[in-house]
């Protein structure tokens, strides 16, 4: 294989790795957002119950 061909293959591998890394990172961001929403809903449910709200003043204000 010539030097130019090896460099082209190297660039293709770097590009493919970057694309896979970028898309998997965005997928994990969506998962983190869903988990944060679930936690917020759970805390809001707790804050509507007086005993739970009293035992968690940091979250319920």
Swiss-Prot record:
| Sulfotyrosine, modified sites | 59
User: Taxonomically, what lineage is the organism?
Assistant: Eukaryota, Metazoa, Spiralia, Lophotrochozoa, Mollusca
Domain remark from Swiss-Prot or TrEMBL: The cysteine framework is I (CC-C-C). Alpha4/7 pattern.
What is the stated purpose of this protein? Answer: Alpha-conotoxins act on postsynaptic membranes, they bind to the nicotinic acetylcholine receptors (nAChR) and thus inhibit them. This toxin blocks mammalian nAChRs (alpha-7/CHRNA7 > alpha-3-beta-2/CHRNA3-CHRNB2).
For this UniProt record, the keywords arranged alphabetically read as follows: Acetylcholine receptor inhibiting toxin, Amidation, Disulfide bond, Ion channel impairing toxin, Neurotoxin, Postsynaptic neurotoxin, Secreted, Signal, Sulfation, Toxin
Where is it expressed, tissue-wise? Expressed by the venom duct.
MF GO annotations? acetylcholine receptor inhibitor activity; ion channel regulator activity; toxin activity
Q: Which InterPro entries match?
A: Conotoxin_a-typ, Conotoxin_a-typ_CS
Q: Which residues carry this modification: Cysteine amide?
A: 60
The protein, known as: Alpha-conotoxin PnIB
Q: Where is the signal peptide?
A: 1-21
Propeptide residues are 22-44
Subcellular localization(s) per the UniProt record: Secreted
Q: Record's family? A: Belongs to the conotoxin A superfamily.
Pinpoint the site Important in inhibition of nAChR alpha-7 subunit. 54
Disulphide bridges, residue numbers? 46-52, 47-60
Could you state one GO cellular component term attached to this entry? extracellular region
- Extract the ranges annotated as region (Ser-Xaa-Pro motif, crucial for potent interaction with nAChR): 48-50
Pfam families linked to this entry: Toxin_8 (PF07365)
